[in-house]
Amino acid sequence: MTEIERHAHDVVVIGAGGAGLRAAIEARLQGKRVAVISKSLFGKAHTVMAEGGAAAAMGNANPNDNWQVHFRDTMRGGKFLNNWRMAELHAKEAPDRVWELEAWGALFDRTKDGKISQRNFGGHEYPRLAHVGDRTGLEMIRTLQQKVVAMQQDDHREHGDHEARIKVWAETTVTRLLKDGEGRICGVFAYVRESGTFVVFEAPAVVMATGGIGKAFKVTSNSWEYTGDGHALALLSGASLLNMEFVQFHPTGMVWPPSVKGLLVTESVRGDRGVLRNSDGKRFMFDYIPEVFREKYATTEEEGDRWYDDPDNNRRPPELLPRDEVARAINSEVKAGRGSPHGGVFLTVVDRMPGGAEEIRRRLPSMYHQFKELADVDITAEPMEVGPTCHYVMGGIEVDPDTGAALVPGLFAAGECSGGMHGSNRLGGNSLSDLLVFGRRAGLGAVEYLDGLATRPDVPDAEVAAASAEALAPFGRPDGENPYAVHAELQKTMNDLVGIIRTESELAEALETLDRLRARVAKVGVTPVAVGAGDGRGYHPGWHLALDLRNMLLVSEAVARAALERQESRGGHTRDDYPVMSADWRKVNLICRLSGDASAPVTGAHVDLRRQPMEPMRGDLIGLFETDELKKYLTAAELPGGDAAAGGGTGTGGDAAADEEGEQ
């Protein structure tokens, strides 16, 4: 019989990025015993790849900035499909979370008068991103990690044990959420990657903070950990996913050399005067300003360049349009034969900064070293080649906006694996502040749920046995399918058929291919290796991938099915056969649930889809927009004074949806 370790905690946080660590810190500050489970090394979360900054309306660069302006920008960027309550909470609370991070030791760049420096980013009306050069995510993780260590030192002084109230499990992967007989979360099942040891973490509350799904695509800025674990685990436990069709393709990833294709090129380059040019040398973004943004963006190079020094009297350059618009424009230029030699376009800061090469190296140190070391390109003297790369998923676990609670009792989510905050497209910089705002709220939500329990749920032996058998299954098929070959076909399918531009025929083909891949995933097999645990599970990346394939298959089906259903183009979802936004579709959320046998998700279950109406925005919030702008997004009945005028909301932004879901 396979040995299984057991550990008891109050709250288990899955993921050690910005959202996970902030949730864990909050639960620990409230006196709970917390386990943090990190798929990779502690401190190596994908958050470190977020380079540009954390968006927060502190008004340091422009005193006209405030939470209302930030809220408007976020809703515009998401094409009004955002959960408006989440956008409101984020805009209001982001400054406090950034100042809190500074109090914990974060070393932000400063203005001349000593305030936190804020930089420009696409879709933000004012310079709003608090930053540390172009390494902001790294500084965030360093600061949160040091906060965890400081709390562990406090616990050692008080209890004689550094891990008395917060313990980090590095290189550990969760494969199942465990539930008791009443359907409540009671813990998680995981394995330690180094040894292959199985571990059960008993806990009444679980916070999911696992990030995104990028490794389901061939070209991505995401690191190897991003296999849709949180999305899939939530589906398998009975939770729902929201608007999974919206996948953000960051407009600027490296395109050469092939070994680094997709690696992120931060938006800070464009925020710091960088411009995009095609093979003819033309600044082509002026040809791609959509009607909904035309009033706010410069139509000449001269005005766009003046904006950097005089933003009050000029409009911003179109290189700073929201990411979905820029990615589509680059894609169009390449398809028209005006791309760079390696299938991208040119991004340049040469002769664009007043301080010349020295200022480029100071403001963009990571980008300078990245291109110099990986592509032998000196960005102070020559342009970069860039192209779209799968970067972020706006869809995610459906949660209550105030508490982060999912539909399964005891399950909470924050960060990229949760849905709603960003609508159909995320603005750059909103991710890092999102992690802090909703990481804290999910941690508090878990504590409040825990405090309200009359009894702690027990972990059924049958749940553990089933999870163990599922994890061991690939070893029973030594001559089965190669997990790497299956993964490569899955990635190619998503990249080619569910990418930036989508059509009904290609999406239908993708679903057919995914259905065929389902049978292959069920037959994936591995052989034991001669290190680690005695049964050959230690240091076994083939086995790890075999288990991750289940998750990538589920989230890929959710993305493709939702993309086929939504017959419009909005944000990160572009349908070539339905090229315009529809005000009627704006009122619709697409909800994915797992149907069939969740204990056999590859062969016995599939993703079901249904439509769910959006909750009307609260009246005071809709009053922040001009009626002429609202007409671009809303139906006539939704406009102020219409039959379905806004203001009928509950103020929670998610309760009505949750109530409707609970009645199914």
Enumerate the language-model features and the residues they cover:
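Glycine-rich loop(s) and the adjacent beta-strand/alpha-helix scaffold that form part
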Residues: A205-L263, N425-G445
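FAD-site-proximal beta/loop scaffold in flavoenzymes
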Residues: T175-V200, V377-C417, M421
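Glycine- and aromatic-enriched mobile tails/lids
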Residues: T2, H7-H9, G18, E26, ...
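Short hydrophobic core segments
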Residues: V12-I14, F201-T210
